[in-house]
């Protein structure tokens, strides 16, 4: 794989640019470089907006990996919101992989599981709220009911509340989504009419904590004076939020690095599995009533967030211009000429290749990837080398000209329009810090552009076909009067300009009426075709 002799680890997750996924990938890539492994990160964007056809197109990515050739697998299943995605990936891995498998943050039978020790730090969070701040009325927002971390953290909450002799009723526990979409529902539940106001809301991860805090502020509550809030995971975004969110920091980078070490250690015994637990570290901050101990770090993070926001605004504007500029393209070669101008908006990229299915212009329905792929557009070491026509075996993932004997670290995402798969794009980044900055907007623009090119070229073929229908006789295929006028006049003008002679013959077929009357129109048509053959033979 990747045209070199190194072992390759496949990483499967969703939304690689999100903070947990990004830090995990940084750890994986750092660990892989240390021992000389390749890494292929397969990352889709999920079912945003509940667009089922787009989601189907995005899911084609899970059919791209050459599972049988992977030397190790790292799974971040809890990043995949849709059950069908998780089941699809797990099925392919169980049936086709013969290598060590590592599952991050989720217990998976038959895999090495790298898990967070939820008990120790969640207990510490609850102890902090009760002992340090004297709170008794606590609510808990956990994750989905079927999620292992959500179950463990909820059990810990209940156990500690029992230890302190504190009650917890129905409206003190809410099942969230481990994302930002349930803040309003959670607050409606915790603050339901007739229920006593909570002193603190403990959330099972940081995304839900910031969603709850935002909703409380919107409703006029002060944090922490009225209601304290805490999260879990230690996302950097908790430092940029005002007030800074109390949390527990999980070492995602180290989890990624350790995953690589386990894969390397178990190359000869992939069937032997283990569970490894990582401790989280309590970070008391402003949202529970403590002063942030990381004062300088807070200022640094907020400055970075400000800079990132400015960069993001500029990138969004550039992508708008990109969409306008790319709409002028009618061929893939024209895209290659212009794409180099905008790809620098993908932070820290080094190499890029667009890999399209054979016959992608003729696709009419969803069929997935072809065994042979073509790379029409490529950027190598930040230099545009398009147009190219490199054909390669899909199992290698990229053409040989884009690889080397150095460890390869590629991120791959499918290129599609709705459920119509055109191929995929692959990016390699300069270093681990900028790893994984895939942009959904970029991907959508390219997918829509390929659809526009396909539609344009099909329309052009249709126009030519219609012109042929209007200009030629349907029976013989020879030019009719309209065709004679459209093509004859230019020929006369050319002969006149070049001083050349031109031959014009008008042929009338005698006896046509008698053939039709006596033998039928089928025989008449046959006679016309024979005359056409004679003319073509004389004037090929």
Q: Model-predicted segments: where are they?
A:
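Bacterial carbohydrate/catabolite-sensing allosteric modules
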Residues: 1-321
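Amphipathic HAMP/coiled-coil signal-transducing linker helices
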Residues: 37, 321-325, 460-481, 490-493
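Helix-loop-beta substructure at the N-terminus of cytosolic sensory domains
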Residues: 328-369
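A short, aliphatic-rich beta-strand micro-motif
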Residues: 400, 406-416
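Short hydrophobic/glycine-rich mini-motifs in sensory/regulatory modules
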Residues: 415-425, 436
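Amphipathic alpha-helical "output/dimerization" segments
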Residues: 431-451, 458-465
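Short regulatory alpha-helical coupling segments
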Residues: 467-468, 481-501, 530-539
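Conserved nucleotide-binding and Mg2+-coordinating catalytic segments in signaling enzymes
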Residues: 467-486, 507-523, 529
């Amino acid at each position: 794989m990747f045209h070199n002799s190194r072992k390759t680890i496949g990483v499967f997750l969703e939304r690689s640019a999100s903070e947990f996924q990004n830090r995990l990938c940084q750890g994986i890539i750092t660990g892989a470089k240390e021992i000389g492994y390749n890494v292929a990160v397969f990352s889709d964007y999920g079912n945003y907006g509940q667009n089922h056809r787009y989601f189907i197109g995005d899911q084609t990515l899970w059919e791209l990996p050459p599972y049988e050739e992977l030397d190790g697998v790292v799974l971040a299943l809890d990043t995949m919101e849709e059950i069908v995605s998780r089941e699809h990936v797990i099925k392919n891995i169980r049936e086709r992989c013969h290598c060590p498998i590592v599952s991050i943050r989720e217990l998976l039978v038959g895999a090495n599981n790298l898990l967070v020790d939820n008990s120790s730090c969640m207990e510490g969070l609850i102890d902090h709220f009760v002992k340090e701040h004297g709170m008794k009325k606590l609510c808990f927002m956990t994750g989905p009911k079927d999620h292992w971390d959500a179950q463990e953290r909820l059990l810990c909450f209940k156990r500690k509340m029992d230890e302190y002799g504190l009650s917890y009723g129905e409206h003190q526990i809410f099942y969230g989504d481990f994302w930002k979409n349930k803040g309003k529902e959670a607050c409606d539940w915790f603050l339901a009419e007739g229920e006593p106001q909570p002193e603190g809301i403990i959330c099972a991860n940081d995304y839900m904590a910031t969603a709850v805090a935002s909703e409380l502020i919107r409703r006029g509550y002060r944090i922490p004076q009225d209601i304290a809030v805490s999260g879990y995971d230690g996302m950097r975004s908790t430092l940029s939020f005002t007030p800074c969110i109390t949390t527990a920091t999980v070492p995602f980078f180290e989890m990624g690095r350790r995953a690589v070490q386990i894969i390397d250690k178990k190359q000869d015994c992939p069937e032997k599995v283990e569970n490894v637990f990582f401790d989280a570290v309590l970070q008391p901050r402003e949202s529970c009533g403590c002063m942030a101990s990381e004062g300088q770090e807070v200022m640094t993070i907020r400055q970075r967030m400000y800079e990132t926001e400015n960069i993001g605004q500029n990138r969004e504007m550039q992508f708008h211009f990109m969409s306008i500029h790319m709409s002028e393209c009618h061929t893939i070669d024209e895209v290659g000429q212009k794409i180099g101008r905008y790809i620098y908006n993908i932070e820290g990229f080094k190499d890029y290749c667009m890999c399209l299915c054979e016959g992608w212009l003729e696709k009419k329905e969803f069929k997935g990837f072809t065994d042979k792929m073509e790379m029409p557009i490529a950027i190598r070491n930040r230099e545009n080398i398009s147009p190219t026509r490199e054909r390669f075996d899909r199992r290698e993932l990229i053409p040989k000209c884009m690889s080397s004997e150095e460890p390869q670290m590629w991120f791959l995402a499918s290129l599609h329009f709705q459920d119509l798969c055109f191929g995929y794009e692959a990016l390699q980044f300069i270093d681990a810090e900028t790893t994984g900055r895939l942009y959904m907007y970029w991907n959508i623009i390219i997918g829509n552009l390929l659809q526009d090119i396909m539609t344009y070229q099909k329309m052009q073929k249709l126009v030519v076909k219609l012109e042929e229908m209007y200009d030629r006789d349907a029976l013989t295929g020879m030019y009719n009067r309209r065709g004679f006028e459209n093509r004859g006049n230019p020929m006369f003008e050319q002969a006149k300009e070049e001083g050349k002679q031109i031959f014009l013959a008008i042929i009338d077929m005698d006896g046509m009426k008698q053939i039709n009357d006596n033998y039928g129109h089928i025989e008449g048509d046959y006679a016309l075709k024979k005359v056409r053959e004679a003319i073509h033979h004389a004037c090929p």
